[in-house]
Amino acid sequence: MDVVPFGGIQDQDGQIAWPPDQAFVMSVVGFDEASKSTLRFVLPDGTQFDVVSLEGLGMLKLIAWNERPHARARDAVDLCIILVNYHTVAGETLYTEHDDLLDDDFDYQIAGARIYGRMIAPLLAPNDQLRGALVSVLQEQTGDAGHSPLALAMGSECCGEYERRFQLLCALLRGIEDRL
């Protein structure tokens, strides 16, 4: 479990330095936006805690990977796992809210990744800088089908074919653009 800091504790560059000596610096870009999409859980003993939504988690995974791609490969794999499986989370909303995705070339995973993008977009909408940065990262990673470091980092253990991972990223970007 990760404990995530947020709420006005970062500097102007979106970073925090951990006490006591401020030696460990961590980016918290997107944390405030992710905190607005948390889900509250209550344990039988009454203990309450908030968990970031899948939409907020994916946004944070993309930011973390982009900031340190060689050190954050696990974030790319985690994003891939979400993209591959989000159609199961979307469930019936595919037919009730996203039926425009049902075409002759229908593919559950691609539709799920696009729905995921549509669900991330409202988190990005209020923050021009964050929205621009995330869209820019995805545009860069989907600009050349033969060269996407993110699709490569997502790894074959998540989704075997590089081309498929690239398609999922394209669907994610398209979904975000659908709602911006």
Name each region found by the language model:
Residues 1-180:
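Compositionally biased terminal segments of proteins
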